Amino acid sequence: QRDTGWVQYYGESSQEVLDTIIQSYILAEALDIPVMVVLDAFYQSHTSENIWVPDAELVDEFLPPKALKGNEIDPNDPKDFGGLVPPEHYGKFNTDYWADINKVEDLSEKIAKRFEKQFGRKYSNVEAVNIGKQTKIVLVTLSSITTTARGVIKKYPDVGLLKLRLFKTFPRK
């Protein structure tokens, strides 16, 4: 997945997945980079849980208006969209891509803070739980296994948890 070019988020719960999808629109539009929100295929898709679906008006307030950038599909003016870049353009394409992908971590946190103000649920790229001087083991998790790990660290005070929500780009902070 390193070179696919997609930003990757992993959701611990169905609520987090829905909330992250809403936040992802801003990130994808701001940077012109596709975003995937990953849901555990078996554990989350084969269970049910209550989620709060926000009113469309609240989501519309949160999301910026769609900005037309000149790359919209128009049958009267066909264009080629895809991942193939000829060698003479690849250097600039790759430089531009990495300049944008390096903005993901900070922009993701800013979007999450705005989301918390609007909807009252807090998310961050990385969540550290019970990590301190007493910690001997740290469980690093993605997705729904995090919920199981939360139960483990309650029983074992020397075990901490590091939950990754943002995986690509891998958080550096």
Spell out what each predicted region is.
Residues 1-41, 65-66:
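Conserved thiamine diphosphate
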Residues 3, 113-173:
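Thiamine diphosphate
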Residues 3-8, 104-111, 157:
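A generic short-segment signal for beta-strand/edge and adjacent turn/coil regions
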Residues 9-19, 96-107, 141:
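Catalytic cores of large soluble enzymes that bind and process phosphate-bearing ligands
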Residues 14-15, 42-44, 142-148:
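Gly/Ser/Thr-rich loops at beta-strand to alpha-helix junctions
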Residues 19-22, 46-53, 150-151:
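Short acidic, glycine/serine/threonine-rich loops at helix termini
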Residues 26-30, 55-58, 157-158:
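Short, low-complexity, polar/charged sequence segments that are solvent-exposed and flexible
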Residues 35-127:
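Conformationally flexible catalytic loops at phosphate/diphosphate-handling active centers
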